[in-house]
Curated annotation (Swiss-Prot):
Compositional bias of kind Low complexity: 316-326
The species this protein was found in: Mus musculus
One annotated GO molecular function: zinc ion binding
Annotated protein name in UniProt: Muscleblind-like protein 3
Biased composition (Polar residues): 333-342
Keyword Nucleus among record annotations: yes
Matching SMART domains: ZnF_C3H1
PANTHER family from the UniProt entry: MUSCLEBLIND-LIKE PROTEIN (PTHR12675), MUSCLEBLIND-LIKE PROTEIN 3 (PTHR12675:SF3)
Length: 342
């Protein structure tokens, strides 16, 4: 299986801006640099009330004479830059999770290619397994220890699967705050330093689609130097809330990048079996240790059948009943009646 290169694909959703409807009707009283919606020229392609901003224009390198993409004004350009950074973080997280998923799939494919434990009665035709067809001989399958890695072995388990049809948790937004609806009606009894929603002083800060305001990140970091900032400056209690939400989002992203519990199981290192005659140490390379455990148990077995050259048609039963060689019989001096005595 060839490795898969996960490349970041450019997504144009974060470059999309909503077109000002009043501008389309010709009744917008705000200038291009003041309206929070896009005022595209006629050469730009508008689809379903939205227009795509020019990526090269954001980088300051667009050389087209009549560009079909929108060249946004500075206040919309800064908004698109924030959207681009958030989109880049999401793409990197998705790419890392995809690479992790592919690694687990490759490990599962390698594990499935291993031969399964033999449990076939027809294996009794093998002379080395004739004494018990359901138990692997302790000496079978042994390989030199130098050919295998010395570290522990990691095998893939069953990672937790998401249930279909169950909606996931709503993502936390750390760059936006919901505007207090009671404050918009003029009857909010809580002060600006007590309400958990935003009380913006400028109506142009409010996003109509979701009734929220964009947070000034420079103000939270204590370095906003704009005289009239178009972003919302939250009070101290909302700043603490935003920091807690940002910390929770980073913690969730770190947990998503980590391996899920049970995905990898650690098998302890298997010790090599030293040979008494000084030969190369060997051990059983099976994934599970049941064969080695059975081999170490004191199980009564039948007599050992030596491996000797057999003629065609010979069976293990004929070999077991063969007469042992004369060299193994102890010498005993005997006398017969026909022997002459001097």
């Amino acid at each position: 299986m060839t490795p898969v290169n996960v490349a970041l694909i450019r997504d144009t959703k974060w470059l999309t801006l909503e077109v000002c409807r009043e501008f389309q009707r010709g009744t917008c009283s705000r200038a291009d640099a003041e309206c929070r919606f896009a005022h595209p020229p006629r050469v730009c392609h508008v689809e379903n009330g939205r227009v795509v901003a020019c990526f090269d224009s954001l980088k300051g390198r667009c050389t087209r004479e009549n560009c079909k993409y929108l060249h946004p004004p500075p206040h919309l350009k800064s908004q698109l830059e924030v959207n681009g950074r958030n989109n880049l973080i999401q793409q990197k997280t998705a790419a890392a999770m995809f690479a992790q998923h592919m690694q687990l799939m490759l490990q599962n494919a390698q594990m499935s290619s291993l031969a399964s434990f033999p449990m076939n009665p027809s294996l009794a035709a093998n002379p080395a397994m004739a004494f018990n067809p359901y138990m692997t001989h302790p000496g079978m399958g042994l390989v030199p220890a130098e050919l295998l890695p010395n570290g522990p072995v990691l095998i893939s388990g069953n990672p937790p699967l998401a249930l279909p049809g169950v909606p996931g948790p709503k993502p936390i937004r750390t760059d936006r705050l919901e505007v207090c609806r009671e404050f918009q009606r003029g009857n909010c009894t809580r002060g600006e330093s007590e309400c958990r929603y935003a009380h913006p002083t400028d109506v142009s800060m409010i996003e109509v689609t979701d009734n929220s305001v964009t947070i000034c990140m420079d103000y939270i970091k204590g370095r906003c130097s704009r005289e009239k900032c178009k972003y919302f400056h939250p009070p101290p209690h909302l700043q603490a809330k935003l920091r807690a939400a940002h910390h929770q989002m980073n913690h969730s992203a770190a947990n998503a990048m980590a391996l899920p519990h049970g995905a990898l199981q650690l098998i302890p290192k298997r010790s090599a079996l030293d040979k008494a005659n000084g030969a190369t140490p060997v051990f059983n390379p099976s994934v599970f240790h049941c064969q080695q455990a059975l081999a170490n148990m004191q199980i009564p077995q039948q007599a050992f059948i030596p491996t000797v050259p057999m003629m065609h048609g010979a069976t293990p039963s004929t070999v077991s009943t063969a007469t042992p060689p004369a060299s193994n019989v102890p010498y005993v001096p005997t006398t017969t009646g026909n022997q002459l005595k001097y």
